[in-house]
Amino acid sequence: MQTVRSEDNPPKKEEFKRPPIDLLQDLKDGINHVVYNPLGNKIVMPLMFLLESVLLKYVIAAIPYTEIDYKAYMEQVEMIYEEGNYNYLEITGGTGPLVYPAGHVLIFRVLNYFTEGMNHIEVGQKIFRYLYLITLLMQYTCYYQLRLPPWCVVLASLSKRLHSIYVLRLFNDCFTTFFMVLFVLLYTLRSNNSTKMSMVISTFGSLVYSMAISVKMNALLYLPGYLVSTYLINEGKLINCLISASVILFWQVIVSLRFLRSYPVEYLAGAFDFSRQFMFKWSVNWQFLDEDAFQDRVFHTTLLGSQFVAVVAMTLCLYPRLPLDAWKSLKAPFTQVVIADLRFIVPFLLMTSNFIGVLFSRSLHYQFLSWYHWTLPCLIYWSKLPMPLGFIWYICHEYCWNSYPPNEKASILLFTLNASLLCLLAINCMRPVIVNIKRKQQ
């Protein structure tokens, strides 16, 4: 039986009541949005990018350029391309022999053209300014994908030392960082979006990664994270992983072909010298040791072993089934082994494997800050440090890198800060992420 509604008695409509205006609460909500809400990055990121652009212009105009390595880069490039010397053991500059792979040579040959050696350093500074801003834009894209709160994003722009490394020093580390940020961004985009282009992305990502290695070997600190992430992105298909990894070797051969044809042994010995000794007086991280201990091979082996243990522990805590899945991939290299949610584990593995490498690095010179500074907003966020403590940690960390010359006090503080951050990451993040893995029916 239907109820008949009388037209004389229509349902009453609720009157719209405007909420009371509370300017103080609105202000609090606005501040909370641009400080803690990831959506606030739509406001914060463009503003910070604009401020960075203006700041870099000011730094270039107001602070004199400091020559450290750029002149040596130019001398080495001229010895190669003007004198025709391709023997890596004979190519030298004002600061010593050429110790970087052929990608470095290629990039600084281009820079030599634009700056005409040392004649137009200001042109080189402008190029490095653009390099900084492009790298920052990629960082922001990565942060946005990872839903970092704006207060963490701001940390990426607060380093006095980092600005100096780029536009006042012109170090080659900046180009390695550019390629590594691009590589991590590619893998992060893939991990955040289900796509059938896994093979394409992992192959192109491997090419970018190899480009970074061909500029400077510090990119190898990402290698453990790269191997596991590539395996996961390719869903355990070993053949796809091998194809992607082969691209690394392909680029190394292509970019160094001129040297490999002429003096292959000398090139490999000079460009990839893992036994190279670093100068103790410029090492920021181990000043609380004496120089003999710093140069001791036992100390170097201990650092390498500690790095290996930390990386393996981190990986197996996050992905305890890795050995079993890897064994299955070996037995069936063309078969899909795992399908997993990669949104957290891929960027986390990449950034923390690099950070562990930095913590146990034999030496950290001032320019090496660029190796990992861009990952600090993510690491601090993942460590679950509250905002006040996060800023305190960052300020203390920045103090260490701006303390000149390297000294015992800053060195102890730097090691303590980085070790404590790694411990917080272990406490808050080191739990199985890939546990409910869907397996393809055989």
Curated annotation (Swiss-Prot):
Gene name linked to the record: ALG3
Main location: endoplasmic reticulum
Cytoplasmic membrane side: 64-87, 186-200, 258-297, 358-375, 431-442
UniProt keyword Cell membrane present: no
Class of enzymatic activity (EC top level): transferase
GO cellular component: endoplasmic reticulum membrane
InterPro entries noted in UniProt: Glycosyltransferase_ALG3
Membrane topology: Multi-pass membrane protein
Keywords of the record: Endoplasmic reticulum, Glycosyltransferase, Membrane, Transferase, Transmembrane, Transmembrane helix
Name the UniProt record assigns to this protein: Dol-P-Man:Man(5)GlcNAc(2)-PP-Dol alpha-1,3-mannosyltransferase
Annotated EC: 2.4.1.258
One GO term of the biological process aspect: dolichol-linked oligosaccharide biosynthetic process
Summary of the function given for this chain in its UniProt record: Dol-P-Man:Man(5)GlcNAc(2)-PP-Dol alpha-1,3-mannosyltransferase that operates in the biosynthetic pathway of dolichol-linked oligosaccharides, the glycan precursors employed in protein asparagine (N)-glycosylation. The assembly of dolichol-linked oligosaccharides begins on the cytosolic side of the endoplasmic reticulum membrane and finishes in its lumen. The sequential addition of sugars to dolichol pyrophosphate produces dolichol-linked oligosaccharides containing fourteen sugars, including two GlcNAcs, nine mannoses and three glucoses.
Location within or outside the cell: Endoplasmic reticulum membrane
Transmembrane segments: 43-63, 88-108, 165-185, 201-223, 237-257, 298-318, 337-357, 376-396, 410-430
Lumenal side: 1-42, 109-164, 224-236, 319-336, 397-409
Family: Belongs to the glycosyltransferase ALG3 family.
Domain of life: Eukaryota
Associated pathway: Protein modification; protein glycosylation
